[in-house]
Amino acid sequence: MKIIYMGTPDFAVAPLAALAENGYEVEAVITQPDKPKGRGKTMMPTPVKEEALKHGIPVLQPVKVRNPEFVEELKNLAPDIIIVAAFGQIIPKSILDMPRFGCINIHASLLPKYRGAAPIQQAVIDGEKESGVTIMQMGTGLDTGDMISRIVVPLAKDETGGSLFDKLAQAGAELLVQTLPSIFDGTATREKQPEESPTPYAAMISKKMGLLDFSKNAEALERLVRGLDPWPSAFTFINGKTLKVWKSSVLEKQAQEAPGTVIAADKGGIQVACGQKVLVLHEVQLEGKKRMETDAFLRGYQLKPGDMFRDSRE
């Protein structure tokens, strides 16, 4: 079988490694072009490119996969199947229709829930008790193709976007290896998705999503803190500086103070009034500083009851 693998970030590394470890010969890996990174603007390969080179797999890095020259190059490889995991570009119909087994996608949610670019973070932010991975047949819609297989992964109470990312990457790798034989021998079943998803589209995460709105319920903010760890992180402003919040908890009481007001600041944490209940900050990072527990932070930063967290630097 001629397998082509398309993927870019860390999430797509484990499935590629699993293919190699289980004896599947990958004809080529397609990933995004190298990008400049850091102060020196050094060109850095994608995580998937690095993994492919470890296994001696040829790597193609088209700027746009819909480019006719690239489509022709791919056609000449005569793939039997194309496996896609977080590639980062919309794949045109000319490629979707190319392999005899079509294109399959490893999606990090239990479809039809959480279609879109950020299903992992959104599951944590929404307080889901479980998530998982779906392998689906790709069509022209966004994550709407027929479902071939799924695996359920429960969420821990302290689950973060990062920890769930790692769990689902590994689950996706295992599910892929389990699913491929049935695709190749024709025994795989396919289940159509309903037209409507029971959850909103999980759009790409932006930095501004991390701004803590203390007029909301503290429980929603605590989930936001976990969902956006490690990137882009939840944050607020204090005295004109950004304060990232890495760990928090909910205090089951209703504050009388205005949302955003510091109620208490001691070794037990920084208590902040919210629209409902109280958010306690346990690990923070002041602009230009390292992340630290609030006890250590308070030894170097004077914060007292009545101080206010703001939604801007002003």
Where are these regions (language model features)?
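N-terminal Rossmann-like dinucleotide-binding module
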Residues: M1-R39
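Donor/substrate-binding cores of folate-linked one-carbon enzymes
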Residues: N22, Q32, I81-Y201, S206
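Conserved beta-strand segments of alpha/beta enzyme cores
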Residues: E25, G56-P58, G102
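N-terminal glycine-/serine-/threonine-rich beta1-alpha1-beta2 phosphate-ribose binding loop
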Residues: P36-A78
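Acyl-group handling in specialized metabolite and lipid biosynthesis
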Residues: A203-K216
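An anion-binding loop in the catalytic cleft
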Residues: F214-E314
